[in-house]
Amino acid sequence: MQNNGRPMTAIPGPSVMPDRVLQAMHQPAPDIYGGRLEAMTEVIVRDLKAVARTQHDVALYISNGHGVWEASLVNVINQGDKVLSLASGRFGSGWADVAKKLGADVQLLDYGVHEAFDAEQLAAILADDKEHKIKALTTTHVDTSSSIKYDIPQIRKILDDVGHPALLMVDCIASLGCDRFEMDAWGVDVMIAACQKGLMTPPGMAFIFFNEKAKQAHANLTQVSPYWDWHPRTNPQVFY
């Protein structure tokens, strides 16, 4: 498909970049030791938090979405921790697979590609976990492969109603910038996103948003990956 002579690829992502984004790329790389890049980063962080509707932290990575699947997990779980994963498509199950390869004890609830999660089943599983062995619940907001959108506030309500402290972790790679997402109002503890879909910029960057509860989980880790560690990315001693 073409519009005014420029090819338009109508796929979920990488999405078509606006002309002003393409024009902004036609400039030399900035001095990484100068103030311009640091000032730009401050604006990017501010605007990302506005899109995610959060007052909490965001860590920026040179990565694709699969990278922040891993990064988000290694910042909050130890090997052997139990993770409950909801999936209605290949990306929900893909995140679960990464958790499993990192050594987590993963329970995958796979609902196929035609249905969202079963609220009664989810509530029963969480209520049965009396010892709170489940440390995190992972899910997509929208799974690209199936287009199924999950009701994130409902998942938060289920967690709260049964009094379960598991971290609520949400993949918004396909939805951030396309649909409303209220990280703070919906009680999401960790959210991941990338730049090439709803944010309509070139592929290559991904983001983890996390709140105080997630910070506490991070503080309790026995080990964290030095590259993926979000702490130096949000509290740098120097900018480089």
Feature names for model-found ranges:
Residues 16-17, 196-240:
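Active-site C-terminal subdomain of aminotransferase-like
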Residues 24-71, 94-100:
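Conserved N-terminal alpha-helix of the aminotransferase class I/II PLP-enzyme fold
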Residues 184-196:
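Conserved active-site segment immediately N-terminal to the catalytic lysine
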